[in-house]
């Protein structure tokens, strides 16, 4: 039971850190390369 409580307290923290860093990465990519849906490579 203690392991389950430890897991339930760790998983939201890791998920928050992961999604926060992912959102920050996407924001920085969109800041450096705006309008990424239409890359003007052609």
From Swiss-Prot:
Protein's UniProt keywords contain Transmembrane helix: yes
Species per Swiss-Prot/TrEMBL record: Chloranthus spicatus
Function: May help in the organization of the PsaE and PsaF subunits.
Listed HAMAP family: PSI_PsaJ (MF_00522)
Lineage of the organism: Eukaryota, Viridiplantae, Streptophyta, Embryophyta, Tracheophyta
Pfam family, one: PSI_PsaJ
PANTHER family: PHOTOSYSTEM I REACTION CENTER SUBUNIT IX, PTHR36082
Principal localisation: plastid
Gene Ontology BP annotations: photosynthesis
Keyword tRNA-binding in record: no
Membrane protein topology class: Single-pass membrane protein
Name of the protein this chain belongs to: Photosystem I reaction center subunit IX
